[in-house]
Design a protein with these regions (language model features):
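NAD(P)+-binding Rossmann beta1-loop-alpha1 motif at the extreme N-terminus of oxidoreductases
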Residues: 1-63
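Conserved beta-strand segments of alpha/beta enzyme cores
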Residues: 26, 53-54, 93, 118, ...
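Structural beta-sheet core signal
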Residues: 29, 94-96, 137
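Short low-complexity, flexible loop/linker segments enriched in glycine and/or proline
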Residues: 43-44, 71, 134-137
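Rossmann-fold NAD(P) dinucleotide-binding segment
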Residues: 59-119
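Rossmann-fold dinucleotide-binding core
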Residues: 100, 106-159
């Protein structure tokens, strides 16, 4: 299973690192700042620590991944989805773990589901940098049950 990340800042990198340690082998990611010289080294180090392959666009992540975790600042969640979702293939699970508003999450869900994907709103309820991939996360949406099943081998704390 390929797990992709849209956004690879502190949250995504922490989750990816934990997943890698649990045995996830196929991790891919895109970050909008990856070509900004101020961030290239830091992002490269995070990718290396999680053994995550860099992709050139978020749409490429959606095209290749079975599960996509979008971990961008809340103000960018909808615009990130609009850029990523055109690459989505039917059956892909798109998980938004941002703190975007309910109205924005609904818009993202519509975008995902119109492409044949399944949406998950993931509300992280703990200390992410400490708990990493095991941060307690409340999940809802059309893809929630399947997301819990797919991620079970990685000992995430999803409900």
């Amino acid at each position: 299973m390929i797990i992709g990340f849209v956004g690879f800042g502190e949250a995504a990198a922490a989750i990816a690192e934990g997943l890698h340690e649990e045995g996830a082998e196929d991790l891919i990611c895109f970050d909008a700042m990856q070509n900004d010289l101020r961030f290239t080294e830091k992002l490269a180090a995070k990718r290396a620590k999680a053994n995550a392959a860099r992709k050139e666009t978020s749409a490429e992540v959606c095209r290749e991944a079975d599960v996509v975790i979008s971990a961008v600042p809340s103000g960018f969640a909808l615009s990130a989805a609009k850029e990523a979702v055109p690459g989505l293939t039917a059956g892909t699970i798109y998980v938004d773990v941002s703190t975007a508003t309910p109205a924005e999450k609904k818009r993202i869900a519509v975008l995902v589901e119109e492409k044949g994907g399944r949406f998950v709103d993931g509300a992280m309820m703990g200390t992410l940098l400490k708990d990493r991939h095991q941060v307690p996360t409340l999940c809802c949406g059309s893809g929630a049950t399947e997301y819990l099943e797919k991620m079970a081998p990685y000992h995430m704390r999803l409900t």
